[in-house]
Amino acid sequence: MNFRTEIKLGTAPFEINYQHEVMLVGSCFSGHMGDKLKEMKMNVSSNPFGISFNPHSIAHSISRIIENKEYSAVENFNNLYFSFDHHSSFSLLTKEETLMKINIALHEAHNKLKQANFLFITFGSAWVYRHTAQNRLVANCHKIPNKEFSKELLSIENITTLFNALIGDLKAFNPLLNVVFTVSPVRHLKDGFIENQRSKSILLESVHRIVEANFNCSYF
């Protein structure tokens, strides 16, 4: 008797070898993949902005990496300086240290993405949080009270429009880049079972539409 679901994987439309440069961005699933590739001694860099779950924040971080536009301002809460675009691992006690850490990672990512052969983008959730006072979507709420945010669900149209444009920017920046999309299997049950399923459905359909519309893009 078989107590598990076995999935037979087809042959991928690409091959990665030890000469290739690989960058991974997105949810914690991308971090796990990056760790596995590093264990295999592959040339890998992952999450230069830290873990990010929603497609909007992921796209924003990639655009910022392409532009190589430095950060000059950060927020402050609970005696820590932080960026709404970054994971809390970038939060430090002084503004200067925080900006330095953020901008060093930004410049390194710009150079690595320029040379990369593969970019893995992992979506985690279509649910996003908007900071009400600043009217902006954030990658991380940094434990700021919930009352300062509103919760929204990204649409398939929003995600596909955003990434179809981004793919064009990526190809102009690095014509040899192959983009591989994944959707994290990790369930976000804090959103609720049904809400998690809605989110994953939106992400999967969005990814397949993006892949079908763009050359050198694939789904894994």
What is the role of each PLM region?
Residues 1-220:
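Extracellular glycan-modifying ectodomains
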